[in-house]
Design a protein with these regions (language model features):
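Acidic/glycine-rich beta-solenoid
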Residues: 1-149
């Protein structure tokens, strides 16, 4: 697919009411890397290696940029004036997500069986309980009226 056109015609007269055309570009690996809408700046996907997303731009303006660790897991996402930092446990589980707006920070706690047992944030803490066979049996939250049993 290198382009597409969308048109809207009047149902009775078939007169053209609206038309929009978008072109697409691909890199040497065949992955989409650019979308060019009518009369708008191009949207570009910045990738590396086998197609890992490193960022996106609208014209010359960066929309989002990603930093990854050697396992290609996202560790930092920058978008506008915000930065989201993500950390992982040695087992590869999500450990924390911290946004430079403190109300959006989250910490994740896992038990020795690899089960998520707590998500903590400034607004609430959500705890999970499991049966001996590993089935989720309950969710308790510090927010009112949200417990599930």
């Amino acid at each position: 697919l290198t382009g597409e056109r969308q048109t809207v015609h009047h149902p009775q007269t078939e007169a053209l009411l609206w038309q929009h055309e978008t072109r697409h570009a691909y890199n040497a690996q065949g992955l989409a890397n650019r979308c060019i809408p009518d009369s708008l700046p191009a949207v570009e996907w910045l990738t590396y290696g086998s197609g890992y997303l490193a960022g996106m731009k609208l014209g010359d303006t960066p929309l989002v940029e990603y930093t990854r660790d050697r396992l290609h897991r996202e560790t930092l996402r920058s978008f506008g004036r915000y930065e989201l930092t993500t950390a992982y446990t040695p087992a590869g589980q999500l450990q924390s997500q911290h946004l430079n707006s403190l109300l959006s920070d989250r910490d994740y706690t896992w038990n020795d069986n690899g089960e998520l047992i707590r998500i903590s944030s400034p607004r609430q803490t959500r705890s999970y309980s499991y049966s001996t066979t590993g089935r989720l049996t309950g969710v308790h939250t510090t927010a009112a009226n949200l417990d599930i049993r």
